[in-house]
Every structure is written in C-alpha cells, then in structure tokens.
Amino acid sequence: MILHIAITTLLASMSACSYEMDPVLTQRDWDGTATYFQSADEHGFSMYYKPQVGFVGDPMPFYDPVAKDFKVMYLQDYRPNPEATYHPIFGVATKDGATYESLGELIPCGGRDEQDAAIGTGGTIYNPVDKLYYTFYTGNKFKPSSDQNAQVVMVATSPDFKTWTKNRTFYLKGDTYGYDKNDFRDPFLFQTEDGVYHMLIATRKNGKGHIAEFTSTDLKEWASAGTFMTMMWDRFYECPDVFKMGDWWYLVYSEQASFMRKVQYFKGRTLEELKATTANDAGIWPDNREGMLDSRAFYAGKTASDGTNRYIWGWCPTRAGNDNGNVGDVEPEWAGNLVAQRLIQHEDGTLTLGVPDAIDRKYTSAQEVKVMAKDGNVTESGKTYTLAEGASVIFNRLKVHNKISFTVKASSNADRFGISFVRGTDSKSWYSIHVNADEGKANFEKDGDNAKYLFDNKFNIPSDNEYRVTIYSDQSVCVTYINDQLSFTNRIYQMQKNPWSLCCYKGEITVSDVQVSTY
C-alpha cells in the first residue's frame, strides 16, 4: 500500500511537470525565436561525404564498368598526419553522387624509406583483357637526397577493387624524359577510340609547367609521347583530367597559384585544338571567365561519366577554428568534404556546374517559411517580398540539411542583392553571398561588424534580370546555383539551426516562390 501511494505520487508529480518538459512545446518555442544559436557540425555528413575520422583530399573518381557504379578514391587526411607516411588512398562507392558507401583503405602508404611513404593523387582505369583495375598514383619520397626523385608515378592493381597489389618494379620518373624529378605527379588515364591508353602527368620542364603524355596498349609498358600541353605563363595545373563530351574535348584542372586556387577548364573540338589553347601562352580561354567552374572552396575537381551524366568531385576545405572568415591567399587547411556536381554543356561548348538529380531528390520534407523580422522598406504580398535598397527579411531557422529556392527579379542589371546565413535578430555579424550584377560575379562576404570581402566567382548575368536561385546544404557545406550559370561552393559554419535572410544592397528586388525543404 505504501509502495502504491509512492508510485501514484511520483506519477502525479511527473504529470504536473510534463508540460515544462514537453518536447513539442520546446520545438514550438525554438521555432518561435530568431536569435543567434551556436550550432556545430554533427559527426557524420550524409551527402557531402566526410569519413568518420579525418577528411577527404584530392578525389580520384572512376566509373566502374563491372559494378556499374562510381568509385571515388581519395587521399585520406588525418589530423594530425604522421610525419613521413601520410595520405593513404581510401575510397567510396556511389550510384548517383548523393549517397556513399565507404570502401575503407584501399592502397596504404609505403614505409618511411620507400618511394611512396606519402601518396599523392592519381587515376584509375579498368583493363577488360586481364580483368584488372589499374590505379596509377604519385609516390612522394620522404626527405629525398639530391640524387633521389621527390615524386615518381607508381601503380597498384586489383581484380575486385578491394585487394590491391603494388607493383614494386614500376617507377615512372620524370628526369628520365627531361622533366622535373621533384614535380612529376597527378597521373590521369584515358583511352582513345583507337584503343590506346594515355597517361597525363603534371610536371615542369626547364621551370615551365607542362602536362607530359605517355602512351600504352596494355597499361604495362609506357612510351613517352612528349608534352601534351604546356601551362599558361608561370601557372601550374594540378589534377589534370581530359575527356570528350559531345563534340568537344576538355581539359579540367586545378590552378595551384595562390591568387587563383580554382578548378578551371579549356576546350577544343579536337585534341589538337585543345592543346593549342595554351601553346606559346596563347590563352585561348573557353569563356569570359577563364574557364572558372566554381569558387576557391571547391578544389582538386576531377570527373567521371556513366555514359549519360558526367559528374565532377572536388573537396570543400575546412577552416581553422571553424572561422568562416579564415580565408587567406591560400586556403588555410587542406582537405575537407567530398562535393559532387554535374557538368552542364551549353550549345557553344562552354561548361558550367549544376546539381546532380539525386541530390535534388533527397530533400523531400517541405518546411514552413516564416518571416521573423524585417528591416527597411519591405512590402509583403503572400509569399512575395519586394525589398527596397537597404532592406532585409529574416526567415525562421534552417534545419541540418536544407534546400532553399526562390526567384529574384531585379529592377535593373545594376541591382545588388544577397543571401545571408548565421543571421539572428541579435547578430552583430553574419556571412552572405552577394550577387553583383554590375560586376558579373557573386561574392562571399562577412557582413555587419568588421565586414570584409572574402572571395568571389564570376558568372553570366541574366539579360532579363531574373535569378532562379537554389541552395543545397549539408551542415556547414553549401552550394549555391543560379540559372545553370553559377556554382558557388562555400563552407559556412553554424548556418544550420540559425535564421537566414534576403537582402537588397542596391536598387530594388522582388523575391517570389521562397521554399525550404529538408531530409
């Protein structure tokens, strides 16, 4: 009886306080506030992949004709890395660039005194004759002596893409062919219609950047074919990737120079026309933005095609101290999250990047969009907002994974607007993507106190001043797309679980069809 009374009393007590602990009420209160919240990335990224431990560096995508999926090898970056033996090759498998299966470590680093103590990026190809996968990669020597090669191209093979065997008799050295022995790396493989295999290697010759070419009929014996392409001026093209898409040949590469640090491309209707784009520093650019495909927050991009779509995988860097503004002449931290995008080929052969369909399809849960605060002259009509110069609208908190879409109609091609994140009603500073039509680019900037420009990406401004904007985020990684003309990858810490806003910096804009969804 005493026990029964005690239990009854306890249940009554719990019932009395259940209102205060009600998770629905807590959620309601949370949604009803718009002040800044110090959020943090969760342990796992589900779409812009990151391993449970460490980070993704220099992806090496390959379409597997046997398994009928994409295999994306990458350099595993531990923090901290061992002094001498670092960046083993790990891998993931994906059908669509939206979900990944970890393959774990595939090719380990060599020993401290071996040529591949540290591993650099490379490329994979399948040989249907011997039914082996071949991965050619860069072997980085630890503290090479003056008579040793700092970088050598090496190879490992596998019958099943699981168990790999290094060929300890294959060492392709640059100085054997008149190239630099310390810059001889990033091998890339492709096969032409005549059945010949081509290997391209980023290197230098007499101090100038070159892409060396080697050819083979069996992937075992290789012959030098001289220089495939020279590099413009004093620039150096990392992670070269050559492919044919429709009627055009392309070279996609990552510009190493600190002032650039972007993925770019050249094009030609034939391989010879492609090679001529940089010959004698010709600078025959493919478009009006020197072939820039994304911002400096998308690097080491390489492509693979399943015969229908061609995707590009690069990494979005982390930033020291989780500081969105910690961007110097070069990204302060190497490696980050794996980001997949889709190549869009336009009628004139130019390329831009778009979202893979499978990523777009992930966001199936529509969210209510609520105005939490307004500043300046804002006219609201249903879900359409007209913002005069200096006006802004703050919307309710985002989730962890977000798809944001809306259409902006500007009054002229001189108008300037932006999308801001980590912007609470009490925030002193926040981070924004500024769309500057008069300059033909989008900027990533810190707004509010201690405002500053961080970096930008150019794109073709619409002649009708209408911008169809879609933003995809997975925790702190987000990619903004505008009109199939702009791809703008960014790392924005704390954007999840915080309010966001639309702003008009110059002129007048009308924003319609604002939608947010999650998964």
Predicted regions located by residue number:
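Beta-rich carbohydrate-recognition and catalytic domains
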Residues: S18-D186, F190-D234, K244-D294, C316-G376, ...
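Exposed low-complexity, polar/acidic, P/S/T/G-rich flexible segments that act as propeptides
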Residues: L338-A340, K506-Y519
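C-terminal motif of bacterial Sec signal peptides marking the signal peptidase cleavage site
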Residues: S13-A16
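Short tryptophan-centered beta-strand motifs in secreted/extracellular beta-sheet-rich domains
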Residues: V242, I404-F406, N465-I482
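Flexible glycan-contacting loops in extracellular carbohydrate-active proteins
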Residues: T489-T510
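Short, aromatic/His-centered strand-loop micro-motif at the edge of beta-sheets
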Residues: D447-R468
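Surface beta-strand/loop "capping" patches
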Residues: T350, G354-A410
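Secretory/extracellular carbohydrate-interaction modules
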Residues: K383-F444
